[in-house]
């Protein structure tokens, strides 16, 4: 891939990461550390580059979704602890051992398989126990309707396992409505109950962690050993319209750009793009932009009023977004020409178009939007 500004590209300013990490640290207790979640290629930003920058900021623990993501970091020379948050197929347990990774043990049965494999290799597998306090996804169920503390204790004492920590995950920490605030607080109570019962059994629980990004923003006073931010060190939240309890000042590190490939004038009653969903009412000047849904720009925002920036002004996307291209109306903007830069996320001559706007047009969350953008869009990093 061309490591340069091609037909479409991302510009990622890694110098802003240190500021964002410091904003996180201002929110949490001094003794609490950061486990940076860099899954999904660091939400599309580039996991290796972002992780190395975070290490410069004092981050010493990473979380990923899968064993292959963890191996990618190891092969790039990252030696910090790495927690695999998701499922590793038993046939791939050997990678966990070979690369000194930490596996999540999310059920008694799964932990038994991990322990059996480790014993067959005459070693121990490192891991953290996952507790289901209300997400009903992965984790040993420890809720009001079922409370399987015996399974948790058996995992801790299982031959072949080296359990180094325990964690759970909030499901609605982003929602401060009374109903969901009570739900989140009950998750905290359940997690603390598990910790107390583990200690009561004479077992040290190891490192503890519960807060995701919104757990940090809305419940910063919690004093577990680690917090698990993902989007925050990238300078964004899942939804900037949500009320939060704190007032951090994060700096978005990513911009999305593309080139104009052609400018043309069309007459009245001329259709644009597939499906003929847009038809001009009068003479219009349109520009074709060299980015499309194969690059990750969502087709769902076709012809609904979504905008981009060019020459510091907003231009509307017209017609259906194509696989490799989209069209914009630039009738009101002077001197648009081939090669001009279009900003789809970011800043242009003092104007700003946030990822949140694209997210709202696409009716999703920023986590999803940032993961849209595919590998064929080069990432251009600014590091000084």
Where are these regions (language model features)?
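Active-site-proximal beta-alpha core segment in soluble small-molecule metabolic enzymes
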Residues: 2-4, 8-11, 16-19, 26, ...
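Active-site anion/phosphate-binding pocket segments in diverse small-molecule metabolic enzymes
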Residues: 2-14, 18, 69, 88, ...
């Amino acid at each position: 891939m061309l490591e340069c500004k091609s037909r479409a590209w991302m510009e990622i300013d890694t110098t802003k990461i240190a500021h964002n990490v410091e904003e996180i640290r201002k929110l949490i207790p001094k003794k609490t550390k950061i486990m940076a979640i860099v899954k999904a290629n660091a939400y599309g930003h580039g996991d290796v580059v972002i992780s190395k920058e975070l290490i410069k900021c004092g981050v010493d623990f990473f979380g990923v979704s899968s064993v292959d993501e963890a191996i990618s970091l190891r092969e790039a020379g990252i030696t910090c602890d790495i927690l695999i948050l998701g499922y590793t197929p038993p046939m791939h347990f050997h990678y966990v051992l070979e690369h000194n990774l930490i596996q999540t043990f999310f059920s008694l049965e799964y932990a038994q398989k991990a322990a059996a494999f480790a014993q067959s290799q005459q070693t121990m597998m490192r891991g953290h126990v996952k507790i289901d306090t209300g997400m009903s996804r992965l984790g040993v169920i420890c809720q009001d309707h079922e409370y399987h503390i015996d399974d948790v204790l058996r995992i801790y004492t299982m031959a072949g396992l080296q359990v180094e920590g325990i964690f759970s995950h909030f499901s609605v920490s982003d929602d401060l409505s009374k109903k969901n605030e009570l739900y989140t607080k009950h998750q905290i109570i359940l997690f603390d109950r598990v910790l107390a019962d583990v200690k009561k059994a004479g077992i040290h629980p190891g490192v503890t962690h519960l807060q995701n990004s919104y757990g940090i923003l809305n419940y910063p006073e919690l004093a577990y050993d680690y917090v698990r931010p993902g989007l925050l060190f990238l300078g964004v939240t899942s939804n900037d319209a949500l009320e939060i309890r704190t007032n951090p000042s994060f700096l978005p590190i990513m911009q999305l750009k593309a080139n104009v490939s052609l400018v043309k004038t069309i007459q009245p009653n001329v259709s644009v793009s597939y499906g003929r969903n847009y038809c001009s009412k009068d003479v219009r000047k349109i520009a074709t932009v060299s980015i499309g849904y194969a690059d990750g720009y969502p087709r769902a925002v076709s012809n609904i009023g979504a905008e981009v920036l060019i020459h510091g002004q907003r231009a509307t996307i017209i017609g259906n977004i194509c696989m490799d291209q989209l069209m914009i109306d630039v009738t009101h903007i002077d001197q648009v020409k081939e090669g001009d830069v279009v900003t789809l996320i970011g800043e242009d001559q003092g104007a700003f178009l946030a990822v949140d706007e694209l997210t709202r047009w696409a009716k999703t969350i920023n986590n999803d939007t940032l993961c849209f953008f595919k590998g064929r869009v080069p990432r251009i990093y600014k590091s000084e």
